[in-house]
Swiss-Prot record:
One of its GO terms (molecular function) is ATP binding. It comes from Burkholderia mallei (strain ATCC 23344). The record marks 30, 81 as: Important for tRNA non-discrimination. Gene3D superfamilies: Bira Bifunctional Protein, Domain 2, GAD-like domain, Nucleic acid-binding proteins. Its EC number is 6.1.1.23. Aspartyl-tRNA synthetase with relaxed tRNA specificity since it is able to aspartylate not only its cognate tRNA(Asp) but also tRNA(Asn). Reaction proceeds in two steps: L-aspartate is first activated by ATP to form Asp-AMP and then transferred to the acceptor end of tRNA(Asp/Asn). L-aspartate binds at residues 172, 218, 455, 496. Belongs to the class-II aminoacyl-tRNA synthetase family. Type 1 subfamily. This is Aspartate--tRNA(Asp/Asn) ligase. It is found in: Cytoplasm. It catalyses: tRNA(Asx) + L-aspartate + ATP = L-aspartyl-tRNA(Asx) + AMP + diphosphate. It comes from the Bacteria.
Length: 598
């Protein structure tokens, strides 16, 4: 039926007869000669239909966009002046001898080359959307990334082992997707949030190096970089320390980027402690392309009359930080007002600022509504610590540390990536990877009045912090590490707990008693008693990596059939109701939401 792909018909086939199959991308009637741009997964080729072959020409007159057709014809060079340098096949055309309509198409709801389609339209008609060249490129790129990951891991001695999709619900973290059991009435499986426990069990079982490219499921609120089901390159290895694990998977990411998109990442990724990342950038996934950093001012603002600064400076969880923007004096009041509204999204109550017109004049060279509320020592500290120069602007955030980090961190990125930031060299092009390490082991949950695991409860504390598990859990740092690239966390992992007594101590620190621990994790605690080896691993978000490589706006652009931000599939209309008989078989009765009283 087909001898060549359309997009691969080039000058090497001149003078040969070919058989092509594909879709009509565009049909043009030029004064009795019909031109068809025929498309398949490899690209386009121009087909010329002359009227001297009456049966073929009649068929060509009847085809429309997205008809699926077969063409047989002669490859010839294009006439002078009609060469299309933008196409791989742009120097040739196919003179059609025979045209068969394999399947007609109704009028498509949109043109495939329309770049202004809403995401709703695209996802509703996903099959047609996937015919678009960009989507074809994205999914083939995804395939190549997966292949190169497999090649690398295979060369390093990793074994691809599947783990269960129907498993036990262990509600520590995001909500599980639950699957009712028909056979065991009233009991439920959960879809895995990750293969975490199974891959640890595989290490205990002496498989030494495991990986799989697998689906994971989390019932959480969605954002541009989240899906209810997502794909991980999931890895675990025994008898390697934290540094060795990071080196191994840093090499994997370098290999993938080089072989798939020809990018040479740094020979060595910088390593930054979590505390430093939060202090300098307000984020545990800093975008190092942006050349702006926080300046710590909390201690210098404790005794100022300006309560907006002094109150958080004297509060246990408060912070005062500054962000100096070189040449920011050019920003208009309208720009500043826009940034003020922007930081409110992140909980900030406002945005204080100082323009440095002439630093040598001290406070007289500063322009700001807040200068009058600051004493000379605090002003000197601001100018000295930020390194402010004439023509700069300094923005301030003062609140709970989380609000300061979130709001000023978001402002840093917004300014850095703005047209102003690009014009003034505040952002670099390219790829800026790093490792963020030494995360807190626990976070305190005020509502539950207990510590919760910052990563997951199977992460090992640093050796020197083991004693804090029982005396001061808040001081514990974890052997955890995230790989960050251009402000995205693309991978995260840790060294795991391999001794039962340490795992039990962690459960106690989390207020998980012995009975609860046995009920939820007894199989793990049992396995750890049989000479479990030191082990650790990492999981990479395949969707995120491909999104970055493709320059896509959302991971929905690199997944064949994604869900919306409301966790719905617009193509299949899932989720959907099921009939009463199915529910009865599962021993389930639906409880309808209560209607508000009139």
């Amino acid at each position: 039926m087909r001898t060549e792909y359309c997009g691969l018909v080039t000058e090497h086939l001149l003078g040969q007869t070919v058989s092509l199959c594909g879709w009509v991308h565009r049909r043009r009637d030029h004064g009795g000669v019909i031109f068809i741009d025929l498309r398949d997964r490899e690209g386009l080729v121009q087909v010329v239909c002359d009227p001297d072959r009456a049966e073929m020409f009649a068929a060509a007159e009847g085809v429309r966009n997205e008809f699926c057709i077969q063409v047989k014809g002669l490859v010839r060079g294009r006439p002078e002046g009609t060469i299309n340098a933008g196409l791989k096949s742009g120097r040739i055309e196919v003179l059609c001898h025979e045209l068969n309509v394999l399947n007609a198409s109704v009028t498509p709801p949109f043109q495939l080359d329309d770049d202004n389609l809403s995401e709703t339209t695209r996802l509703t008609h996903r099959v047609l959307d996937l015919r678009r060249p960009q989507m074809q490129h994205n999914l083939r790129l995804r395939y190549r990334v997966a292949i190169e990951a497999r090649k690398y891991l295979d060369e390093q001695g990793f074994i691809d082992i599947e783990t269960p999709m129907l498993t036990k619900s262990t509600p520590e973290g995001a909500r599980d997707y639950l699957v009712p059991s028909r056979v065991n009435a009233g009991q439920f499986f959960a879809l895995p949030q990750s293969p975490q426990l199974f891959k640890q069990l595989l290490m205990v079982a002496n498989f030494d190096r495991y990986y799989q490219i697998t689906k994971c499921f989390r019932d959480e609120d969605l954002r541009a970089d989240r899906q209810p089901e997502f794909t991980q390159i999931d890895c675990e290895t025994s008898f390697l320390g934290e540094q060795e694990i990071r080196d191994l998977f840093e090499d994997m990411i370098r290999h993938i980027f080089k072989t798939t998109i020809g990018v040479e990442l740094d020979a060595t990724f910088p390593v930054m402690p979590y505390s430093e990342a939060m202090a300098r950038f307000g984020s545990d996934k800093p975008d190092l392309r942006v050349k702006l950093e926080f300046t710590e001012l909390t201690d210098a603002m404790k005794d100022v009359d300006f309560k907006v600064f002094s109150t958080p400076a004297n509060t246990k969880d408060g912070r005062v930080a500054a962000l100096r923007v070189p040449k920011g004096g050019e920003l208009t009041r309208g720009d500043i007002d826009g940034y003020t509204e922007f930081v409110r999204i992140y909980g900030a109550k406002g945005l204080a600022w100082i323009k440095v017109n002439e630093r040598a004049k001290g406070r007289d060279g500063l322009q700001s509504p807040i200068v009058k509320n600051l004493h000379d020592a605090s002003i000197a500290a601001i100018l000295e610590r930020t390194g402010a120069q004439d023509g700069d602007i300094i923005f301030f955030a003062a609140d709970r540390a989380k609000v300061v980090n979130d709001s000023l961190g978001a402002l840093r990125l917004k300014i850095g990536h703005s047209e102003f930031g690009k014009a003034n060299g505040l952002v670099e092009a390219g790829w800026k990877p790093l490792w963020v390490v030494d995360f807190p082991m626990f976070e305190y949950d005020d509502e539950e009045a207990r510590y919760v695991a910052a990563h997951h409860p199977f992460t090992s504390p640093k050796d020197e912090h083991l004693e804090y598990l029982e005396t001061d859990p808040g001081r514990c740092l974890a052997k955890a590490y995230d790989m960050v690239l251009n402000g995205w966390e693309i991978g995260g992992g840790s060294v795991r707990i391999h001794r039962e007594e340490v795992q039990s101590k962690v459960f106690r620190a989390l207020k998980i008693g012995p009975e609860e621990a046995q009920a939820k994790f007894g199989f793990l605690l049992d396995a750890l008693q049989y000479g479990a080896p030191p082990h650790g691993g990492i999981a990479f978000g395949l969707d995120r990596i491909v999104t970055m490589m493709a320059g896509a706006d959302s991971i929905r652009d690199v997944i064949a059939f994604p869900k919306t931000q409301r966790a719905q599939c617009l193509l299949t209309q899932a989720p959907s109701p099921v009939d009463e008989r199915q529910l009865r078989e599962l021993h389930i009765r639906l409880r309808q939401p209560e209607q508000p009283k009139a």
